[in-house]
Amino acid sequence: LCGVDGFGLHLYGASSTGKTAALYPALSVWGEPNQLRHSWRATANGLEGTALAHNDALLALDEMGEVDPKEAGDVAYMLANGQGKTRAGKYGEMRLPARWRLVFLSTGEVTLESHLASIGKRVKAGQQVRVIDLSADAGAQMGVFNQSHGMNAADLADHLKQQSRQHYGSLALDWLRYLTQHSAQVCPVFQNVRQRFLASLPPESDGQVRRVAEKFALLASAGLLAIQAKVLDWPAQSVEAACLSQLNQWILARGGVAANEDQQAIRQVRSFIEQHGESRFTPKQTGYSSQVRQRAGWIDSTGPQTLYLFYPTGWREATEGLSPDRAAKALMAAGYLVPDGNRPQRKVSLPDNTRPRMYCVKGSILDD
């Protein structure tokens, strides 16, 4: 109804924090939770069939760590994009791919980024706006819960599971009935909430952040409409407040509102210096040293702040997998690169009597 692409919310954190228990109340809206809860432990083809079976409903997948990390990134795209593989028919003709629309919930001890990193793969920005990582630590030392209602966290988790297995299935019918009878109200509510959520972002927010804000606005809109439908008995202001809080926590965890590629550039350059700061950078004040092999650049500690001077070859290595030019612009924008006017490289006089153009990175990048 609102034209928003599919997406998933991924609860990640240590074992026994209530991640799986959080799936049960959500699933109980649609039916018996144990019958509707699925595992990530499946092939991409298997999950395609599972997604199709949950078209226009909720899909819940437990334990992301059980899916092959080689397939995890592609599966994330597939689930959110709502389209399976294009296949050939019995006689070689093209078969139409399976299509669906859904929001999915996911749990796991690791994020999608960490899961892909376990085999040396880098998460893509498009995957991170389709699978939105949310910490299972609510900050109250009770896992996913921020209040226990007089119980300890473990008992509350068990209570939610038990109640969800006893009372289930009826709310979805009331919800769908309300939506079909009041479909004209849906988009105006969403547009108003969307406008408020986008207005809450800093002006410099990247499009990726705005897309995720739009998805949280959709969730908040669903909550407000469910209250109007008397499906939920919650204070209206609590719905928007909760969704805005999660959006802000997501922004905080990702490191800000800049594009993911720009943040990745800063992380990679910082990591490169941390790993190779002494072994591949020659101290400028002591002159040439044959001890440095595969030199990436020089260290200049003669000024008020330390500078790591990258040769273009060293810069390309430090920003491998990214655009070196875009990475330089990202560090310039963050204040970590000393430019020559608008140019990211500047000429530097070196002890070996050369004066090459180099990328001059401030040592303060290691402090943040």
What are these regions (language model features)?
Residues G8, N34-Q35, F104, Q128-D133:
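Conserved beta-strand scaffold positions in the cores of enzyme catalytic domains, especially
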Residues L23-L58:
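Short glycine-rich substrate-engagement loop in P-loop NTPases that contacts/grips substrate
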Residues N55-L58, R99-F104:
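Loop/turn-to-beta-strand initiation segments
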Residues L1-P33, F216:
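P-loop NTPase catalytic core of nucleic-acid-dependent motor ATPases
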